[in-house]
Amino acid sequence: TPPNLPRKIPDGVDVPDVHTPESGLGGVVAKSAGAERSPVMALVGNWRNLTWLKTIGPVLSAGRSVLVVAASAAEVSQIADRAAATWGELVVRIAGEDDKTDTRAWQSAQSPPRLVIGTPKTASWLIGGLGLAIVLEEGRRAMKDRQTPTLHVRDLMRTRSRLEGFNLVFFGPTPSVELLAAGAETVREGNRAWPLVEVVDRTEDQPGSGFLSERSLAAISATAKGGERVFVFTHRRIGFASMRCTRCRTLRSCSRCGTRVGRVDSCPRCGTAIGACRNCGHTEFEEMGTIPDRLVSEIDRRMGPGAAVVHPADGLVIVGTERDLAGLPMVALAVAADVDGMLLGTGYRTTEEALRQLARLALAVKEGRGTRLILQTSRPDSLLVTTMRRGDPIPYLERVLVERAREAAPPASEMIAVEIRGAVPEAVATDLASLEGAVAMGPIDVLDGKRWLLTGSLGKARIGLRPLVGRWRDWGATVRVDADPIDV
């Protein structure tokens, strides 16, 4: 946080007279304007239409400030540009351009009323006269600090709200299961949390038909010929593409535990060798998803050379991955090339992450006639696809909560990952096993080091871990401690 510079804090700005539309935010906005407390809210809906920016007027008119936390600088800029058209000089933008700009923004944020829009680092900023904070898509990876002590914006803002007295709303299509488990009040914004979805059943396609179905290619071609943008979503790595039998079209899976697998020799969950198709015994499989460059080639064969490009190149048909969604302009058509591949893996967050990514992809689709998200899948009746079709994430996430409790995974229990890079002190395993109330698992190999997991009720273990980490660092080891890690 920049230093306190009281003599440089500017005077307040007059609030424009703006009509307040109806919104799920209405109740908490009214209470925030009257300095009344409201329960923490999980507002389930489409924040990217930005119509909700006009609903915060009563808070600003009451002389109080509003903080909006977005996951990326690109999204901060998009929101701030739209907000400035309504609220003018009240808008304070913190996109992390440079220290001088951030300090100037911090000075402005001290003179309410202000609409402060910033990246996750602003969650720790003192905001003058803060009455309402809105956090967008708190489940995103960017909302958690990768460096020790790995603070999460969700936990930081909940603590600040309780201590400082401002009201707090988490707004997005898929609230995290941690937020639901914490008892946040769930409110739906509109009938659907994301735009319309079309499902393409890939079991109808003949083997060797390619990574994109004929229906998807036709939709991509028609949309682009109409001058509208298309985004084709795929995986970062080829090993995460699903595979199906070329004879019976059944998805490839482990014969022992049933885990769906891609191009691997053994099951990542139980270690069993992956052999022939479980359904028919056939030994030939084909990939249903691939890396961006190969999708571009397939689209170009249909539409002509140069028709598709890999993000961040500009064109009517853009192919990219999750990391490209933040700066993506709104599109008329989005295509998820391999929905089934999104469920590959053994991490306890896999199912929640799949829904979150697809919902986020859906929010990139603009409102309008014929605009939609296409999901390609060989399991059209799966719970994930059914949830996307219905536009309501809550039943799916409640089921994830039950599964987490059954597996004793967060938020049903606590989990800490301890990573040591470089030379590992000999007594690490013994030290971790001695922590009271903790079950120590590991180590497993990670890049340049080892990782251990601690699970259980970790209140006393956290206290005991601190001197151990200090001792290991004094010994010369590089130690990273991650509470409730994402990639496990």
What residue spans do the PLM features occupy?
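Amphipathic alpha-helical segments in well-structured domains
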Residues: 150-154, 292, 296, 351-355
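Cys/His-rich short segments
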Residues: 216, 222-302
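C-terminal helicase module of SF1/SF2 nucleic-acid helicases/translocases
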Residues: 175, 211-228, 298, 302-488
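Structured core elements
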Residues: 134, 169-170, 231-233, 244, ...
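Short hinge/gating elements
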Residues: 138-139, 143, 278-285, 338-346, ...
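Active-site-flanking beta-strand signature of metal-NTP-handling nucleotidyl enzymes
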Residues: 196-201, 268, 278, 335-336, ...
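Hydrophobic alpha-helical scaffolding
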Residues: 170, 206-210, 285-289, 348-351, ...
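Accessory, non-ATPase domains that flank or precede helicase/AAA+ motor cores in DNA-metabolism machines
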Residues: 1-198, 202-205, 214, 221-236, ...
